[in-house]
Structures are given as structure tokens and as C-alpha cells.
Amino acid sequence: MNALLTNPFKERLRKGEVQIGLWLSSTTAYMAEIAATSGYDWLLIDGEHAPNTIQDLYHQLQAVAPYASHPVIRPVEGSKPLIKQVLDIGAQTLLIPMVDTADQARQVVSATRYPPYGERGVGASVARAARWGRIENYMAQVNDSLCLLVQVESKTALDNLDEILDVEGIDGVFIGPADLSASLGYPDNAGHQEVQRIIETSIRRIRAAGKAAGFLAVAPDMAQQCLAWGTNFVAVGVDTMLYSDALDQRLAMFKSGKNGPRVKGSY
């Protein structure tokens, strides 16, 4: 296989190795490159809740390419045209949000594969993914290098988790704590005892099925707990939240009445 098509992130997931990541919501190549120099195993470039265009995603992929941190792209949704664009700009690993059923999971898998194995549109000669046609036999090799992760973040998805885990081509399942807690009736309270119990059970089910389990936890104790439950790819922070907290902390050093950083959000 061409060296440009190797996917060390996927290979480490196959081996069950733990990989620590960072969420990127700042939408700039400059910030993405700074994060890539820090040494995280993977970087999630967010196109769901961060206002990233395809061109923004493209520039961030370029910015992190020289470094060891592996980029994971989360598009706003899992439609076939959007997945095609994200793969063509060079993403090797995708995290697809809001996958509730096995049928949805199969559709996402199909969107990432060229015919006859799927429905990905053919355009390698004009795509960064194939280095504009310079990677020989790209279509024959690329499937093995793609890593497909799906998000389970609703009660419906939990009810269908075993069927989703049975779908061939799904490499890992990521638990979305914020949406999941809201769907379970505990909005903005992913730390609720019942939500935590369900998260633990789900992680163990995912690993028992031979898939990788993922999570985003901005609180260090929650990240450690997820690792203890068996999660093997964990994002331990969000760049915009870390930046915001650092600003608050620095200001609190010089202005009275400031209480310092707070953990913001549902993660």
C-alpha cells in the first residue's frame, strides 16, 4: 500500500491501544497546527457544531499533515454527497454524528466505499485524497485505510446498539454525552448517575463486540473513568474551552472579583 494511504490511528484501534485526543472547534488552520504540535494522538476537527466549511476543513487537514497527530473529521451529518467531499479533501477517519439505526450505519459505510462495495462517487484525479491522481491504484487500496466511527447519542441509538455494532465497516462507536443525556431526560447533566450507568454499560458493550469505543470528556476525572471502563479513544478537551478557561484564569490573576475558570457545557 502507498505510504500516504496508511492509517496509524485505525491500526492502533485494531490493536486496542489507548489514544488521547483533542476537540478542535476554533475553525482555523493556525490553531489546528498549534494543537498538532502538542503531541495528541488524534485531533477531532468539528464540522457539526463548529462553523467549518469544506474549505476550512481542507486547510486544517493541510495544517496538521506534517505532524503525528491524526485528524478525524466530524461532518455536520452523514449524507452521501458530504461524505464524498470530506473524503476527497483527504480525510481518512470520519466521525458521523446522530447514527440511530443499523440501516443508517450501512448507508454511511456505503457512502465511504467505491463501487462495487459502495456508492462513493469517483473523482480521484481531481482529489487531494489521491494526490490528484498521483497515487497509483488509489481506488483499489483506499478502503483498507479508511476508518469509520459513528456516534450513538440517543435512546433510539442505544436500543439499536447491538445491530449497529454488527454492521461491517464500522470501526468504532463514539458515545455523545451531551445529546445522549438530553435524550434520556437529563439535559445538560451527563454526570447524572443513570446517565453514567448507561455510558459505562454502552462502552463495555462496544468493546465486547470487538469495536473501538470513544468519548469526549473535558473533566479529567471523567476521562479517567471512561478509560477505566475500556474506552480506547478519548478526547480530553476542547480547544475553544481551554482557550476560554485560560483567558479567565489569567484575568483572575490581575482583577478582583473573578473566580477563575469554570467547566462549561455538558461534556
Swiss-Prot record:
Gene Ontology cellular component terms for the protein in this record: cytoplasm
SUPFAM superfamilies: Phosphoenolpyruvate/pyruvate domain
Site (Increases basicity of active site His): 88
Site (Transition state stabilizer): 74
Domain of life from the UniProt record: Bacteria
Entry keyword Magnesium: yes
Cofactors, names only: Mg(2+)
Keywords: Lyase, Magnesium, Metal-binding
Protein name as catalogued: 2-keto-3-deoxy-L-rhamnonate aldolase
